[in-house]
Curated annotation (Swiss-Prot):
This is Small ribosomal subunit protein uS13. It comes from Mycoplasmopsis agalactiae (strain NCTC 10123 / CIP 59.7 / PG2) (Mycoplasma agalactiae). Part of the 30S ribosomal subunit. Forms a loose heterodimer with protein S19. Forms two bridges to the 50S subunit in the 70S ribosome. Located at the top of the head of the 30S subunit, it contacts several helices of the 16S rRNA. In the 70S ribosome it contacts the 23S rRNA (bridge B1a) and protein L5 of the 50S subunit (bridge B1b), connecting the 2 subunits; these bridges are implicated in subunit movement. Contacts the tRNAs in the A and P-sites. InterPro entries: Rbsml_uS13_C, Ribosomal_uS13, Ribosomal_uS13-like_H2TH, Ribosomal_uS13_bac-type, Ribosomal_uS13_CS.
Amino acid sequence: MARILNIEIPNNKRVVISLTYIYGIGRTSAQEICAKAKIDENIRVKDLSEAQLSAIREIAKEYVTEGDLRREVSLNIKRLMEVKCYRGIRHRKGLPVRGQSTKSNARTRKGPRKTVAGKKSTK
């Protein structure tokens, strides 16, 4: 297994697919990295030379990835919550942030149903 940015990427997959195993690098970023390093996207990682791997490592260092990216995202969410803007309030309450309807759906964000006892009818 090749090691790029302290992440083990699979050897038997194409370079573009293997690079997406790094948090913060998707298909487009992986294609850009391959283009800058002048490496064919269809080559398997196991077939790369050490010079090509080091070229990929140098280019990938320019991207915000892994722990730094996770920290940046969490700080952005914390900032929204501190400012108490609408998005921050939705994050705090654990509700959908991007305007989705919550009357009938949004179970993923809200969690399992909390049943409330209905009113008992008197006879």
